[in-house]
UniProtKB/Swiss-Prot annotation:
Name the record gives this protein: Hydrogenase expression/formation protein HupF
Species: Rhodobacter capsulatus
InterPro entries noted in UniProt: Hydgase_assmbl_chp_CS (IPR019812), Hydrogenase_HupF/HypC (IPR001109)
Protein family (similarity comment): Belongs to the HupF/HypC family.
GO molecular function: carbon dioxide binding; iron ion binding
Disulfide bonds: none
PANTHER family on file: HYDROGENASE MATURATION FACTOR HYBG, HYDROGENASE MATURATION FACTOR HYPC
GO biological process terms, semicolon-separated: protein maturation
Length: 106
């Protein structure tokens, strides 16, 4: 499973971005998100930014990752997934469209 980490861009130099990750400085490749600017949050995986995030999305992902770290250390999730607990599960749009069209088998 791949897990992206939200990081905040401090500076942009071409396709290179200086970031803060868990309080430590780092670098990410911005080739996939050329619209990213200093101050933006991006989802990074293996040294490359994959997506520009809203501050709210970055906070939700950070909370979820923090909850998983707590769980792995023997703690509990707390409210790490509060955004999911307050709603019913949803199908991805393509599966919902198939279900709405009456398709029930693969």
């Amino acid at each position: 499973m791949c897990v992206g980490i939200p990081v905040q861009l401090l500076a942009v130099d071409g396709i290179r971005g200086d970031v803060i990750e868990d309080g430590r400085p780092g670098l990410v490749d911005l080739s996939l998100v050329p619209e990213a600017r200093p101050g933006d949050w991006v989802l990074a995986f293996l040294g490359a930014a994959r997506e520009v995030l809203t501050p709210e999305a970055a906070a939700q992902i950070s909370a979820a990752l923090g909850g998983l770290r707590s769980l792995m250390a023997g703690g509990d999730l707390g409210d790490a997934f509060a955004d999911l607990e307050a709603r019913s599960p949803q199908l991805p749009p393509h599966l919902q469209a198939a279900l709405d069209a009456g398709k029930t088998r693969a």
